[in-house]
Amino acid sequence: MYYKFSGFTQKLAGAWASEAYSPQGLKPVVSTEAPPIIFATPTKLTSDSTVYDYAGKNKVPELQKFFQKADGVPVYLKRGLPDQMLYRTTMALTVGGTIYCLIALYMASQPKNK
């Protein structure tokens, strides 16, 4: 048996399954058909041409070989000096922010004496 909250009696009342699963005051949508799609610009199907839209070369296989090389260097430092600078800057800002937050929490926890 299914139950539904009655807004009139403010109690649970027996109900059919279709009534119990639909919210009060809302009816299920009758039309399940999707409206036609309208495009602002004409679309091109992917099967129309086999030419790539970009002029660049696919670098993914080369980068996969480069990053999967077993040379003992972490992936986030593989590209040399720029990665080292970015890593060190990120770590410095993280440590500095943590220290700043701890100092702010300490100062906020101390009562002010008048």
Swiss-Prot record:
Gene3D superfamilies recorded: Cytochrome c oxidase, subunit VIIa
SUPFAM superfamilies in the record: Mitochondrial cytochrome c oxidase subunit VIIa
Entry GO MF terms: cytochrome-c oxidase activity; protein-macromolecule adaptor activity
In-chain residues carrying the UniProt-annotated modification N6-acetyllysine: K69
CDD domains: Cyt_c_Oxidase_VIIa
Membrane among keywords: yes
Induction statement: By estrogen. Expression is induced by ATF4 downstream of the EIF2AK3/PERK-mediated unfolded protein response, thereby increasing formation of respiratory chain supercomplexes.
Pfam name, any one: COX7a
Subunit: Interacts with the mitochondrial respiratory complexes III (CIII) and IV (CIV), promoting their association.
Official protein name in the record: Cytochrome c oxidase subunit 7A2-like, mitochondrial
Annotated source species: Homo sapiens (Human)
Gene: COX7A2L
